Curated annotation (Swiss-Prot):
Belongs to the major facilitator superfamily. Oligosaccharide:H(+) symporter (OHS) (TC 2.A.1.5) family. Responsible for transport of raffinose into the cell. Can also transport lactose and melibiose. Has weak activity with maltose. The keyword Cell inner membrane applies. The record marks E272 as: Substrate binding and proton translocation. This is Raffinose permease. GO terms for cellular component: plasma membrane. It comes from Escherichia coli.
Length: 425
């Protein structure tokens, strides 16, 4: 598929805008969640770690299920409708259920918040990404360029949220619920089409959404699956844990918390704009260096950002390190999908992504989030960052020898149907 066909594709624009709105809504939650938990709710760093552990707990409860459901539904929008409808109640839940429960009992609040946030964001994001990636292969547009719109949505919201948070934090959540109403309208208008190439592949059975339980379980007998999980836990998961409370560390370099939050919002926006530009170019880069090398580059960038934060002493340094996030995200996300569709059976792409990537990250984060929270309280941010950075570096080096660089597809031996090779360009 080329750029011209992508830009003339109606599905590209509809699902690009869907990405924009969904990540706009998500940005009303995650970038400022640790600050909201600390300043508004009044939680300690350890209690904040408990909340994030519960988010991970319920994310891993939902992700395998959503992965299998997504592969079975194919291009049907049932699951996406469920996630979008729940997002309408985002603000009422945070303000009238989540916060009061956290004041009443940390575990009651953390578990309740984990159910909601774990479904609509932690697991829901993976389901939506896997669905749109499937649509991109069926309709004939480039997934990486559609995903770029998500970066722009996050960027716009980060600036608005950074300003509104200092006025009234509740306004940020209501902005998210308002965006969900537009998301429902866009989803109603979405009518995924099928390109001529995809129709031929469907006729051959290459893109069949009919999968069996045996096919799913056979994934866990594959060395390639476990090596991908190792990379995900040791690199992507550790990086996510590092980034969870980075906003608190970031604002410590400013004279007032308000100035730090505002600067964090602007830095996030600038980073996401750069993220979008790089995301647009990522398919071109990945096609030249390969999916494995793309994941290794992402690991190197994450190592630099985490370890660099351990030695940062000025506001300028911490802003530059924050901007490195713009380089890491495109290489990790698009590289992961490229690796999955290049190594595994494309009929199981959503299952591999939600179990091998999202599920494994969240499962490990249950322990790592609480562990990191204790380290923050005992050792401080920078000593903890050094430990996390060394873990990421070590696993990245190991992955250079364990990830597969073969262009051939590995698919369950229990299924003999022909499988075509589909790539994200």
């Amino acid at each position: 598929m080329n750029s011209a066909s992508t830009h003339k594709n109606t599905d590209f624009w509809i699902f690009g805008l869907f990405f924009f709105l969904y990540f706009f809504i998500m940005a009303t939650c995650f970038p400022f969640l640790p600050v909201w938990l600390s300043d508004v709710v009044g939680l300690s760093k350890t209690d904040t770690g408990i909340v994030f552990s519960c988010l991970s707990l319920f994310a891993i409860s939902f992700q395998p299920l959503l992965g299998v459901i997504s592969d079975r539904l194919g291009l049907k929008k049932n699951l996406i409708w469920s996630i979008s409808l729940l997002l309408v109640f985002f603000a009422p839940f945070f303000l009238y259920v989540f916060a009061p429960l956290l004041h009443l009992n940390i575990w009651a609040g953390a578990l309740t918040g984990g159910v909601f946030i774990g479904f609509v964001f932690s697991a829901g994001a993976g389901a939506i990404e896997a669905y749109i990636e499937r649509v991109s292969r069926s309709s004939g547009f480039e997934y990486g360029k559609a995903r770029m719109f998500g970066c722009l949505g996050w960027a716009l919201c980060a600036t608005m949220a950074g300003i509104l948070f200092n006025v009234d934090p509740s306004l940020v959540f209501w902005m998210g619920s308002g965006g969900a109403l537009l998301l429902l309208l866009l989803l109603y208008l979405a009518r995924p089409s099928t390109s001529q190439t995809a129709m031929v592949m469907n006729a051959l059975g290459a893109n069949s959404s009919l999968i069996s339980t045996r096919m799913v379980f056979s994934l866990f007998r594959m060395r390639q699956m476990w090596m991908f999980v190792l990379y995900t836990i040791g690199v992507a998961c550790v990086y996510d844990v590092f980034d969870q409370q980075f906003a608190i560390f970031f604002r410590s370099f400013f004279d007032t918390p308000q100035a730090g939050i505002k600067a964090f919002g602007f830095a996030t926006t600038a980073g996401e704009i750069c993220n979008a530009i790089i995301m647009f170019c990522t398919p071109w880069i990945i096609n030249r260096i390969g999916a494995k090398n793309t994941l290794l580059v992402a690991g190197g960038i994450m190592t630099i950002r985490i370890t660099g934060s351990a030695f940062a002493t000025t506001m300028t340094e911490v802003v530059i390190l924050k901007m490195l996030h713009a380089l890491e995200v495109p290489f990790l996300l698009v590289g992961a999908f490229k690796y999955i569709t290049g190594v595994f059976d494309t009929r199981l792409s959503a299952t591999v992504y939600l179990i091998g990537f999202q599920f494994s990250k969240q499962l490990a984060a249950i322990l790592l989030s609480t562990f990191a929270g204790h380290l923050y309280d005992r050792m401080g941010f920078q000593n903890t960052y050094f430990v996390l950075g060394m873990i990421v570096l070590t696993v990245t080096v190991i992955s250079a020898f364990t990830l597969s660089s073969s262009p051939g597809i590995v698919h369950p031996s229990v299924e003999k149907a022909p499988v075509a090779h589909s790539e994200i360009n």
